[in-house]
């Protein structure tokens, strides 16, 4: 999409959580003791145990590495404080001149250092905020920005409904690569999850990029479903309609995305490693 190509720091759109990645790449409503989920919604930090360390790694594409780390601290019964880092290293790339002749190589990387705070506002309702400092290096060029994520989560434990609203990457650049300041990858999301009492199944639906009114409605939608084999083991999959649409080759009735948009995963939570 043109809007994404015109924004900076698009690594912030990538899921830190392997769980969220398995469910279509976007999920802001899962209530679990998983610190990586609070990168998607700061209100979910309240579900993370005290003194929890989180680490994640993804080989995003050839030569590119994406990593996340966090530490969570409970502040009494209602508040939670966490610190986190998101880091993307794009590796070494060719540097060419105007005639496409290679004249050398350069490295590119981006990092966001974050502080996360969540607080129980009312019964079943939690609010959260993430403050982040972002810096990017492309060869000899550097830019910096500040941003904020705002999140709300309402969770009804008896019926296992979870509903969230998140506004991500509100802010702007404080230092541009050159003279022109870039735009932040602002994203407003709404999501819902439901766990069924009679079946060990949880389903999720998340609407993303709601500030982009020119998208077809279906391209805002991410769907996910999980089978909860136990309190510690899940197997799930998801479908990202927008990704499937963008990866479709051709515009005929027989055009195919060749499986793009589908995602799958599984997870196990080992108590002794918490």
Q: What is each stretch, according to the model?
A:
Residues 3-24, 28, 32, 50, ...:
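Outer-membrane beta-barrel porins/channels
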Residues 35-47:
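N-terminal periplasmic accessory domains that precede
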């Amino acid at each position: 999409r043109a809007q994404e190509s015109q924004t900076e720091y698009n690594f912030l759109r990538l899921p830190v959580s392997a769980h969220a990645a398995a469910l279509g790449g976007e999920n802001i409503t899962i209530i679990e003791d998983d610190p990586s989920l609070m990168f998607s919604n700061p209100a979910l930090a309240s579900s993370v145990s005290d003194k929890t360390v989180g680490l994640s790694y993804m080989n995003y594409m050839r030569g590119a590495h994406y990593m996340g780390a966090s530490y969570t601290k409970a502040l009494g019964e209602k508040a939670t404080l966490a610190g986190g880092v998101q880091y993307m290293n794009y590796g070494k790339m060719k540097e060419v001149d105007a005639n496409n002749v290679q004249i050398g190589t350069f490295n590119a990387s981006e990092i966001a250092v974050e502080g996360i705070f969540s607080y129980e506002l009312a019964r079943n309702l939690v609010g959260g905020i993430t403050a982040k400092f972002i810096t990017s290096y492309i060869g000899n060029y550097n830019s910096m920005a500040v941003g904020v994520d705002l999140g709300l989560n309402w969770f009804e434990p008896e019926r296992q409904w979870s509903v969230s609203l998140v506004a991500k990457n509100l802010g702007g650049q404080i230092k541009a690569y050159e003279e022109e300041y870039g735009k932040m990858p602002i994203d407003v999301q709404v999501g819902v999850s439901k766990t069924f009492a009679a079946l060990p199944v949880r389903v999720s639906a998340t609407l993303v990029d709601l500030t982009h009114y020119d998208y077809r409605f279906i391209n805002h939608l991410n769907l996910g479903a999980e089978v909860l084999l136990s309190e510690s083991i899940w197997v799930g999959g998801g479908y990202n309609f927008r990704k499937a649409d963008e990866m479709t080759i051709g515009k005929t009735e027989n055009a195919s995305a060749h499986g793009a948009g589908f995602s799958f995963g599984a997870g196990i939570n080992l108590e002794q490693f918490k």
